[in-house]
Structures are given as structure tokens and as C-alpha cells.
Amino acid sequence: MSIINKIFISLILVLFTTSLLAEEVKKVGKFKDWETLVLTKSDGIVCFAQSKPVLQSPKKNKRDSRLFVSFRPNEKILDEISLTAGYEFNKQNSITAKSGKFKYKFDISQEKFAWIADNKVEKKMIRTMKKGSRIMISGYNSSGSQTIDHYSLLGFTKAYNEAK
């Protein structure tokens, strides 16, 4: 076998193996302002509903914000609410979600992401999201400036049920 053939076969094997190990995200459905996706990883799948804000403040700073509700069956994690505001959170200030008269605090933040620590609180927030039409997320960046993201909840229930 020539050296060219050996290199060619080795290259094909490397590409094939790499593609098997790569994570794959597949869009399962779009439901008004929400969508459902499935992330396939080597250690299992993550199903999640996500949305982008319909309104952001301040307007001058374009950020890649998202609100998620995730399910990780292999890890026995259900109804995990998380968000990213597109910047690293300030640890001195709270990150909150407000819909109608209900307010929820994100207890954990790491770099650009935040989570709610208590699954009971997550379930309450999900019930609120199913009944509401909009939710407002408030956070603070590393310089202490507040940002507010407004998310539409149109399509949330269908996207949530599809992810579940």
C-alpha cells in the first residue's frame, strides 16, 4: 500500500471518528416565539426549549441572550431553568425573573450563565410561564450596569411539552 493511500485512509478514519464524537444539535420544532432542540452528546441527550428576547434594554448593547428549560434524562435532571444574558454576571447583584406578580431569583451564576438552585422554584416558575404572556429577566454586568430582557411566552407551553 502506498504512503498516499495510507494517509488517505488515516484521514478518513480521523474524520469519521471525529464526527461520531461531535455533539449534534437538532431543531425539533418552532412554536411561535419558542423552539425545541435536542443536543446529542456521547453521554446522553439534552432536550430543551429556548427563546430569545423580544425586547432588550439598553438597546445599544446587542447581546446574545437566551432563556432555556432543559431536560437531561441520563442525569435525572428535569425542568432546569437557565439563562444567558450574553455577558458575565456581576456577583454582587441579583438576577431575577418577573412575570405578573411573580418574581424568581437565579441563585447560581457562572460566567455568562445563571440557574435557579431549587427545583421546586423552577417548577413554580414553569407554571407561571405556562400561564403568562411575557417574562422579564433583570441582571447586572461586571461593571454594575443593569440589563433587562423581555421574553414572549407565546409558544412556551408547546415547546416545553415537546422538550419534555
Predicted regions and their residues:
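N-terminal secretory targeting signals
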Residues: I3, L21-A22
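N-terminal signal peptide c-region/cleavage motif recognized by signal peptidases
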Residues: T17-T18
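Bacterial N-terminal signal peptides that target proteins for export
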Residues: M1-I9
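A generic "folded-domain core" signal
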Residues: A22-K164
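Short, linear, compositionally biased motifs with a strong N-terminal bias
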Residues: L13-V14
